[in-house]
Amino acid sequence: MDEIKLKALAKINLGLDVVRRREDGYHEVRMVMQTIHLYDQLLIQKSETPGIQIHSNLSFLPVNENNLVYKAGKLLMDEFDIHTGVSVELNKRIPVAAGMAGESTDAAAMLYGMNQLFGLKLKRKDLMERGVQIGADVPYCIMRGTALAEGIGEKLSSLPPMVKCPVLIAKPAVSVSTKFVYQNLKLNEQTPHPDIDALITDIRNSDLDNICADMGNVLETVTIPNYPVIAQIKEQMLKSGAKASMMSGSGPTVFGLFGDEETARRARAEMKASGLAKQVYLTSIYNNRR
């Protein structure tokens, strides 16, 4: 095998709660993660040129050790003493720096692809153990599906598959710093926390209406006052018939869950016409695990 082509799927958070701020500065979280059908594509090829060469359709992306794809490749090359060069064609569709684990899922695909390409015979759990060295979301992106993430996001528990439904994605032009969001998060009695356990029960019961009612993201308490366009996009989605709308991760991307394809398609057109979002995609829930 000289090349492998892979899809790197995005994630959304159906629920995101921050439990506490640790003494080391990290935050302990409880998140319900969900893979969706929106994806980047990676073509990974063996190359006569030594090292790792990355080419992307987005000129502003780093193509050196500052890219998690590069880090993932180098980690396996160093561990298994691989001297053959690797070339990566990275076609980005997932919004960048958007709370959808775009870079983490690309790194996960790189680990998976290198494992196949060089016959390393690493099992999924082996890849996940290596993934956590690259980034907290990488192990989940290797696993995929519906999962509860705890700790700093690295402790993963599989959940039953989420109900399939259309998902509308809208990313505004603003950039949101994850560091800024967590630094400005106030954890006190007034902070509205989502009920993650209730959300998990709803998922187990395949109850889309209750899932939508119990969804919540505590980080919106920081982002919405600072970036009003996030609330405007949520409002637009609900006005267009979404059963629920919420920010994913630390934002600024907003997603909406819909009961039927026709309403979702109409909502996509209305979102594009509103001018609130720079990138708009209609996709769906993805439940297959690796």
PLM feature segments, named:
Residues 48-62, 110, 205-215:
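Short, basic/glycine-rich phosphate-binding loops at helix/coil junctions
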Residues 1-98, 116, 120-128, 134, ...:
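ATP-binding N-lobe of GHMP and related small-molecule kinases
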Residues 89-118, 136, 243-258:
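Glycine/serine-rich anion-binding loops at beta->alpha junctions
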Residues 143, 148-244, 259-262, 268-272, ...:
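Conserved, helical-rich catalytic subdomain that frames metal- and/or nucleotide-binding sites
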Residues 34-35, 132-133, 139-142, 158-163, ...:
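Solvent-exposed alpha-helices and their adjacent loops that cap or buttress functional pockets
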Residues 16, 40-44, 137-141, 147-148, ...:
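Short beta-strand scaffold segments in enzyme catalytic cores
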Residues 14, 42-44, 69, 103, ...:
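Residue-level signal for inorganic ion chemistry
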Residues 123-133, 215, 265-269:
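Short, well-structured alpha-helical segments that form the helix of a local strand-helix-strand
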